[in-house]
Amino acid sequence: WKKINTPWGKPSDEILIANVGKEEICFIPRHARGHKINPTNINFRANIDAMKQLDVTDIVSVSAVGSLKENLEPGKFIIADQFIDRTFSRIKTFFDEEIVAHVSMTKPTSPGLSNCCEAALKKLNIKNQKGGTYVVMEGPQFSTLAESRLYRSWKADVIGMTNMPEAKLAREAE
């Protein structure tokens, strides 16, 4: 475990650095070890900056989500390629003081990395769906039935609380 200091404050936790095969990986428990930080209070800027300081070039973000579609049974991995950001209390950019930048989020995920994830899941015989829309809600409460119906009408696949602004900040940090 390695402690990283950032100009954005403390990351959620220390970073676990390990070797998996020939690759070095870095893992940060975004809710902290022991699941102590609620989704709204995660310091996403510090987490992404810590990864940048460690020269991380690719991020695979794993999240617990709920299904909005009957055909997405529990245990099936969704390799999301789109997000609907319904968060409202989180800092969503590195560019809020002294400099403004406009970063495209048209394609918020890497097709190459998505292909790698799909191949790894298939190799492990884990059910998966490549492509899907992830609604990110503020939390920590779950959505109302009316909200879930709305998101289904938008053709969203899954709902969770943690991938925004994480994906936006990762794109800005590229």
Regions found by a protein language model. Give the residues of each.
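Active-site/ligand-binding-proximal alpha/beta "capping" segment
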Residues: 123-157
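Metabolite-binding pocket within alpha/beta catalytic cores that recognizes anionic/polar moieties
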Residues: 1-105
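Generic non-transmembrane alpha-helical segments
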Residues: 112, 116-127
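Non-catalytic positions within long, well-ordered alpha-helices that form the structural scaffold/packing
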Residues: 52-55, 152, 171
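A structural signal for small-residue-enriched, beta-sheet-centric alpha/beta enzyme cores
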Residues: 163-169
